[in-house]
């Protein structure tokens, strides 16, 4: 069972969230979009948004821009990468480890300063140069996932920079969609202090931060001078509210205190529809697994245990529990994806086989396997973690596995993930329940299986250190033809499933419940969304 602390954490957001619903000033005189997020705090406002991918959705792609961004204009076609603050990028013909990025001209930060090559170098220094006055260890921990392949960089001219990778790496540019750029002039203005910058942020994005109060609300206003005139927001203001409790979010929408909620309560869908709300879903690149510790001596270092855990859960029943707000997962990507491959280990619900494998590993109903898992109360892509983990706990118990949960705030769980399974805290755990995006090759696979990504360098929390996986990761980075790359990635997913390095459960369909007053919304096949075309009223 979930601990009493879990229940307290789940309910702790209620009074806070309720207080945050006060209507914004002059709400009747201007168009305002009010959104209840699943996170427990306002994502960092300084261009290095925390709170996972939801942080990027609400405080990254709104206030800031990356060099390369996603086209989020379609609900039917997969999102694709397009030019952002960089208009063109290519490898040097004489040295494919060097990438040239030609930068967009005529772009201004919200403080009025000019975006140029110096701004790019400043943001790289922030993460990669510990001797720089701009260096920010907190921001680095967030942004390094986009920058880790880069071993060198330089300014070529006012609107051109060069990035160098350790080896040939054709995947690197796709990572830069998460590298949002802050203003060097504003950093100077606030006294070269990132804490002060967060109080007075400045990006180049379609929205400006008007005000924000930690753990309560942030108010954004549209940037009428945005460089892409087609993406100047149609709504004047957007209010972001951290509301991690799922029931509180649904109640807020039904009562008209917000216009949009992330992840409505599964049992509230009929009531929300009856109240005139729309339930928006779409297939997005996402997986919701247990990331397993492969530390020597851990029970999950035994492949028989790992396979048994994958066979112990009825995924169709979990989807039914969530009222259809999920899709079963038997690998990092859906089975019809070109990256899925052809694993020999077929993940299905087979409790008898799970018991057999556990018995071979020395466990059983009379000698139960005890495991400790770190989970969150809510968070970006975490869906309904308390409900879902209780379901898994019950199913595992039926095959002789007893789960104990360490329940954390989402940001605390992310910090635990970044520390790795070999950290003092990680050694007390058998797995972590962190949802992952699978939007690009690195995020879908390579950050988990590449030994170069063992913390603190990356997200290989379980400490997978396997020559075959390393070889496949290198091959993927050296492959430029998209169809050939698909084949390499399919081999990676095949090996991940055959080795059962995760316990896969479901893929999210990113449900949003939206007031009937909201128009113009496109629900893309992505973790991100373009709020610019949305209107209210």
Regions found by a protein language model. Give the residues of each.
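N-terminal secretory signal peptides and thylakoid transit peptides that target proteins
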Residues: 1-14
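C-terminal segment of N-terminal export signals and the immediately downstream linker at the start
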Residues: 21-38
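Short, solvent-exposed loop/turn elements at domain surfaces
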Residues: 42-48, 75-78, 171-174, 218-219, ...
């Amino acid at each position: 069972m979930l601990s009493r602390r879990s229940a307290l954490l789940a309910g702790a957001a209620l009074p806070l969230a309720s207080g945050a619903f006060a209507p914004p000033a002059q709400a009747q005189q201007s168009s305002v979009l009010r959104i209840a997020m699943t996170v427990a705090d306002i994502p960092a406002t300084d261009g290095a948004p925390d709170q996972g991918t939801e942080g990027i959705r609400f405080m990254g792609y709104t206030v800031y821009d990356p060099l390369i961004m996603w086209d989020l204009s379609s609900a039917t076609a997969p999102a694709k990468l397009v030019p952002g603050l960089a208009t063109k990028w290519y490898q040097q013909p004489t040295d494919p480890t060097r990438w040239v990025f030609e930068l967009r001209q005529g772009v201004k930060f919200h403080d009025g300063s000019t975006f140029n090559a110096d701004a790019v170098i400043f943001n790289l220094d922030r993460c990669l140069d510990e001797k720089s006055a701009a260096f920010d260890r907190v921001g680095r921990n967030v942004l390094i996932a986009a920058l880790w392949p880069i071993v060198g960089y330089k300014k070529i001219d006012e609107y051109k920079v060069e990035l160098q990778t350790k080896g040939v790496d054709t995947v690197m540019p796709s990572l830069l969609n998460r590298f949002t750029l802050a203003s060097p002039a504003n950093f100077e203005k606030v006294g070269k202090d990132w804490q002060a910058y967060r109080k007075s942020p400045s990006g180049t994005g379609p929205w400006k931060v008007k005000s924000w109060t930690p753990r309560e609300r942030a108010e954004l206003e549209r940037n009428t001078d945005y460089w892409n005139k087609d993406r100047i927001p149609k709504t004047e203001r957007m209010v972001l509210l951290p509301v991690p409790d799922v029931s509180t979010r649904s109640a807020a929408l039904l009562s008209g205190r917000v216009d949009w909620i992330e992840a409505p309560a599964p049992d509230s869908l009929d009531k929300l529809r009856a109240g005139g709300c729309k339930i928006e879903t779409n297939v997005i690149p996402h997986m919701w697994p247990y990331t397993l510790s492969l530390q020597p001596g851990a029970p999950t270092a035994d492949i028989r245990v790992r396979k048994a855990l994958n066979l112990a859960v009825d995924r169709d029943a979990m989807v039914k529990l969530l009222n259809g707000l999920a899709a079963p997962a038997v690998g990092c990507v859906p089975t019809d994806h070109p990256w899925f491959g052809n694993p020999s280990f077929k993940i299905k619900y087979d409790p008898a086989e799970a018991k057999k494998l556990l018995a071979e590993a020395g466990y059983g109903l009379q000698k139960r396997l005890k495991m400790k898992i770190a989970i969150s109360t809510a968070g970006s892509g975490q869906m309904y973690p308390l409900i879902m983990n209780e379901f898994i706990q019950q199913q595992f118990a039926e095959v002789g596995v007893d789960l104990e949960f360490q329940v954390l705030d989402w940001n605390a769980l992310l910090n635990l993930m970044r520390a790795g399974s070999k950290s003092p805290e990680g050694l007390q755990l058998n797995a972590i329940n962190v949802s992952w995006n699978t939007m690009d090759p690195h995020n879908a696979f390579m950050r988990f299986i590449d030994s170069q990504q063992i913390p603190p360098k990356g997200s290989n929390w379980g400490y997978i250190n396997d020559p075959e996986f390393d070889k496949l990761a290198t091959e993927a980075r050296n492959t430029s033809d998209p169809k050939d790359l698909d084949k390499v990635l399919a081999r990676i997913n095949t090996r991940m499933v055959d080795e059962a390095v995760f316990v896969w459960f479901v893929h999210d369909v990113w449900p949003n419940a939206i007031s009937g007053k909201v128009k113009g919304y496109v629900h893309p096949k992505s973790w991100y969304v373009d709020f610019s075309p949305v209107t209210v009223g």
